[in-house]
Amino acid sequence: MSLSEQAILEQDKNIVSNIVQDILCEQISIEKTELNLDLYIYEDLKIDSLDLVEIIKQIEEKFDIKIDDSKILYMNTLEEFIDFTLQTIYMKHGFEYLQNKQF
């Protein structure tokens, strides 16, 4: 992977991370400063199934994707969830999608 590809990947991850964190903060009433990527989704953030359904719905609408609910159960940390969301975006829209879209 070239340096420019790595930079674009980091930029894309930052875009997705910021949006996912904004959605989380709104849904579970937490301050963004309290979040870090190592937090466990269920244990640390205390996200229940109803919260998760709403969070996924908002992410799907924001990025025009469909998240495979069955795979969410295997994600532990916020970073794993963000990485999975980014992969799902790339699979549906390609690598240029986030660079060409205004969020």
UniProtKB/Swiss-Prot annotation:
Q: Which Pfam families match?
A: PP-binding (PF00550)
Q: What does this protein do?
A: Carrier of the growing fatty acid chain in fatty acid biosynthesis.
GO terms for MF: acyl carrier activity
Which keywords appear in this protein's UniProt record, sorted alphabetically? Answer: Cyanelle, Fatty acid biosynthesis, Fatty acid metabolism, Lipid biosynthesis, Lipid metabolism, Phosphopantetheine, Phosphoprotein, Plastid
Name assigned to this protein:
Acyl carrier protein
Q: State the family it belongs to.
A: Belongs to the acyl carrier protein (ACP) family.
- Location in or out of the cell: Plastid, Cyanelle
Pinpoint the Carrier domain residues.
14-89
Q: According to its UniProt record, in which pathway does this protein act?
A: Lipid metabolism; fatty acid biosynthesis
